[in-house]
């Protein structure tokens, strides 16, 4: 077997993967921050914090926008995970978006 750690193509691809992972993390944190702001606004206005119709729309929208290679079912799984994560991180009221 050859030494994979010195393969320049592999190093470049891994670096791109790491950069993409950081961009995903930043996007998730940005989403959580926005949801927290939305929860504050909803609470101030007396709106319901959880909008399941909106959550369903988000999942369907992302499935329609997906150009692969992940499947629509995988998009739904990821979307539902992110919705659950942001609901849990949304603050003391624990509402969703």
Predicted regions and their residues:
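Domain-level signature for soluble enzymes in the chorismate/prephenate branch of the shikimate pathway
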Residues: 1-97
